[in-house]
């Protein structure tokens, strides 16, 4: 089990500010050598020195930021789960999540991440109004920045959400 190669965005959590572009591919030396010989000819493989510096600068605070991300997400998930206007919260840190025990074994004391899914009760108009009225949270697609973001999928997008999709 496991992955032969892992591609990771350095732009998101590792940089932490969303102001640098970079990525990394991690894997066995033989596979990395193959990538260097083949793919890098087509797509390039050198990060700019300035982006490398900014990512290195951001990586220093990564453990502190991730702990805060997970702590905040846990508190927000618990708050939303108890809100009568929220239909469901999908977050593995909640005891109500169907895979909570598995997540607890796998993540231990490290927390359950900074992302969750939830649904606001009501029709499409009510849900759109909820997103439009947010003052501190930005409606945008990304993650790992120094701001909170929301992506409104809604029942028409991505095949629709159910309480706990299988």
Q: Can you annotate each of these PLM segments?
A:
Residues 1-85, 90:
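Conserved PLP-enzyme active-site core in the AAT-like
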